């Protein structure tokens, strides 16, 4: 096991500081006066290749993919003091101190208030299973907010949380973990100082947060984050207040999408109508008329995947013409009524899909870890399926083309990305393209959905440059707010869900995603007796 215990050297490279320790390199960058990056790398590769960051202060291999939406700043040059026992890096707003031996990192604001501290002599570790862990100190009554989409109370003090996107239909909104998102970011608010600090772990392996759930007599009270691989790539966000920290977090990962006005209205949704044996189009149009006759405003309709039924299987991009006789005429009628369709698409492709061989020829799927010539196969709706690899440029282009031709051009600029957690793909070593470098699904899984939403919006704009895309999604990573409106999935129909969906949505707001909602009446289970 590798444990960072002491500093062995310091060097400066183009405004970036590299702190050498006895077992890892620490890369320090002041992105702004209020944002400092501390990246601990045990393999010392330190490759820059992010699908998430909207603001950087360094070159990134994936910069061309995000041209027009990523800003590169000049790193802030901190004042540096190299003492015998301590290194100090100071910006206008933050001071980062590093004790040399035993190594300990502490972050202070300009007034000298301590915002963050690692455990002395044990800040960062790498175990024999290649899991990385970052330990930080806490006070007993600290408040912890964020973590993306999480059940239970808003404050996660003394909670143990997993970051793993899951298809969690019928979840208990008070007690269960995990849900659909993977957002490794939280805000620590000290009750004593009334100051807050944000911690964003830029790593998308499956991970856990222990927020004081355990206690050891040999250490002060602590929390930790632990991931199944990768670097400890920590962004410490100052600003003092929750509002300012969320602002700094969305500076890093992207500002929320500006949605079309209709996205704020009532969006009808029902699996019932699209799954009728026939004439689903007439049934949906009749539903819209009834809603209007009753005096309710309606601005859209989430068209569930029953429209794609082929031999009683959901096959994305196909149309069931028994249910929807003339899709273009149906879409035009819905648009005339002011209730644009938001059609459901999914990244899983059944092996029995009528176009499956065509997809294989285009080489668009995640690959098997043992035989890269074969697709990785997992459970899917209706049978075994393969999964689109959105980290491959050719696969992204193919998805756009199919989406435009078979969905968008039919008469919509809205897309509903669903069932995109890749939860049923159990082989974490399945191979993905990683934009030419090669990687594993375990390394990049939650990013698939976010990239899917990005290219869905691009497809809408390619089809109609004047359109403002409306992308709706159930899953997502940090940065999903740039591209999509989200919701907390297939909740259970109960008064408990109604109550706890509020802190779930609020927690997402504190995680940079204000465009989060819930199935208000629930999705799974019977109606309550009351």
Task: Please annotate each region the language model reported.
Residues 1-263, 267-271, 278-289, 303, ...:
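N-terminal accessory segment at the very beginning of proteins
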Residues 61-63, 297-530:
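Aromatic- and carboxylate-enriched substrate-binding clefts and catalytic-loop regions
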Residues 270-273, 520-522:
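A generic structural motif
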